[in-house]
């Protein structure tokens, strides 16, 4: 796609904001193809961030005042443009949701769930039931696994060796 083509319809002679096709209003996705960027129209409706309604964008909204700023609570601007000092937010524990500590320091250890074994009472870094990704058994890791896994060569497709050990010449 050349730089003077419309990003909505791909034709020359106008820009996307003036596109007569009315496709999408800038919601299209560009995908990388062999010939460069190609436009794929998206059926997602336009949603106004000012009022939350679909069918138009904030610049076309009848509602003049934005929703309240997340920083100061007043309307007319968004948090990134707020003139008030940035409000400090206290970090909360992901385990119990209370402020003042992080999950790794949580007193509610019996409620902590391990992402490795799925049991309660500890977190993954403290898990004693390590799981081998090679054989799927618990109690050891892959480097210490006694079960050999079948390896396949990416060069020739045969099993039993890796590409770096392959005797077949690489084709360009």
Swiss-Prot record:
Swiss-Prot/TrEMBL GO biological process terms: positive regulation of cytoplasmic translation
Lineage start: Eukaryota, Metazoa, Chordata, Craniata, Vertebrata
PROSITE patterns xrefs: ZF_CCHC
Entries under Pfam families matching the protein: zf-CCHC
Keyword check for DNA-binding: yes
Protein name listed in UniProt: CCHC-type zinc finger nucleic acid binding protein
Matching InterPro entries: Znf_CCHC, Znf_CCHC_sf
Any GO molecular function: DNA binding
Keywords: Cytoplasm, DNA-binding, Endoplasmic reticulum, Metal-binding, Nucleus, Repeat, Repressor, Transcription, Transcription regulation, Zinc, Zinc-finger
Assembly description: Associates with the 40S ribosomal subunit, the 80S ribosome and with polysomes.
Localization of this protein: Nucleus; Cytoplasm; Endoplasmic reticulum
Annotated GO CC locations: cytoplasm; endoplasmic reticulum; nucleus
Source domain of life: Eukaryota
SUPFAM superfamilies reported in the protein's UniProt record: Retrovirus zinc finger-like domains
Role this protein plays: Single-stranded DNA-binding protein that preferentially binds to the sterol regulatory element (SRE) sequence 5'-GTGCGGTG-3', and thereby mediates transcriptional repression. Has a role as transactivator of the Myc promoter. Binds single-stranded RNA in a sequence-specific manner. Binds G-rich elements in target mRNA coding sequences. Prevents G-quadruplex structure formation in vitro, suggesting a role in supporting translation by resolving stable structures on mRNAs.
Keyword Nuclease attributed: no
Location (main, coarse): nucleus
Zinc finger (CCHC-type): 4-21, 46-63, 67-84, 91-108, 112-129, 130-147, 151-168
């Amino acid at each position: 796609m050349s730089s003077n083509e419309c990003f909505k319809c791909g034709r020359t002679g106008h820009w996307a904001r003036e596109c007569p096709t009315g496709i999408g209003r800038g919601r299209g996705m560009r995908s990388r193809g062999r010939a460069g960027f190609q436009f794929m129209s998206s059926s997602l409706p336009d949603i106004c961030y000012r009022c939350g309604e679909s069918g138009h964008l904030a610049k076309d909204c009848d509602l003049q005042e934005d929703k309240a700023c997340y920083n100061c609570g007043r309307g007319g601007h968004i948090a990134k443009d707020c003139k008030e000092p940035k409000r400090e937010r206290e970090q909360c524990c992901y385990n119990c949701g209370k402020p003042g500590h992080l999950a790794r320091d949580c007193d509610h250890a019996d409620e902590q769930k391990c992402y490795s074994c799925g049991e309660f009472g500890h977190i993954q870094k403290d898990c004693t039931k390590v799981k081998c990704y090679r054989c799927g058994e618990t109690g050891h890791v892959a480097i210490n696994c006694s079960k050999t896994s079948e390896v396949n060569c990416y060069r020739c497709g045969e099993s039993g060796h890796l590409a770096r050990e392959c005797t077949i010449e690489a084709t360009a």
